[in-house]
Amino acid sequence: MIKWPQKVQESAHQTALPWQEALSIPLLTCLTEQEQSKLVTLAERFLQQKRLVPLQGFELDSLRSCRIALLFCLPVLELGLEWLDGFHEVLIYPAPFVVDDEWEDDIGLVHNQRIVQSGQSWQQGPIVLNWLDIQDSFDASGFNLIIHEVAHKLDTRNGDRASGVPFIPLREVAGWEHDLHAAMNNIQEEIELVGENAASIDAYAASDPAECFAVLSEYFFSAPELFAPRFPSLWQRFCQFYQQDPLQRLHHANDTDSFSATNVH
């Protein structure tokens, strides 16, 4: 049993938040007790510093708030919560939402269209999410909406716009860009061969470097067994940046489970 921090954010009724239940999602069960305790401490501070805003009738209870906070803090478990500076609100729709999108084509004509979005983030603005896709982020499938949007926030700490290169030492930028573009090309080649729907990694990763970093960050944490062997050099760069090794964590958890099973009488 994990011993939680004494100072826990409490509801209006002074009820302790349900961290133990919040941690029970598959994505977080591989963490050690020490990592889970550290993650809860960060998530507790996250809920103190950020405002979660439910929209369009979405009901936000304490368990949902805890799980949202835990997923936000997983990528910065070793980086620190200050890496999530730059926004103060998380807006949460019940389902994917419609936005007005404006874009300029190659000859300078401006177009407007309404599109359905799962999430959005801006450098100095709120993060916008939807609960249906947040729920789909609880497992180890390679999809994680919150980690995707957090990756964009981490990316923009390195400049005015997301580039696919987070804040890393300058001497490592060229190697990062080389490995990231190699991964994009590899994913694009698979798409051309088998089609977007049959591709083993989300085709969105091939659209541009910023999306490649965000999508592969999802796989880094929730499907490391797909990412690591396919892009080993880039995997090591992600491990150095996030200061975590989810594949090693997964193997350790599996070994522990196997040992426990063999010692059951």
From Swiss-Prot:
Extract the GO molecular function terms from the UniProt entry: aminopeptidase activity; metallopeptidase activity; zinc ion binding
Name this polypeptide is given: Mlc titration factor A
| Family the entry assigns | Belongs to the MtfA family.
Name the job this protein performs.
Involved in the modulation of the activity of the glucose-phosphotransferase system (glucose-PTS). Interacts with the transcriptional repressor Mlc, preventing its interaction with DNA and leading to the modulation of expression of genes regulated by Mlc, including ptsG, which encodes the PTS system glucose-specific EIICB component. Shows zinc-dependent metallopeptidase activity.
| Residues binding Zn(2+) | 111, 148, 152, 211
Subcellular location(s): the record lists: Cytoplasm
Instruction: List cofactor names only.
Output: Zn(2+)
GO terms in the biological process aspect are:
proteolysis
Quaternary structure (record): Interacts with Mlc.
Enzyme Commission numbers on file: 3.4.11.-
Q: Which organism is it from?
A: Shigella dysenteriae serotype 1 (strain Sd197)
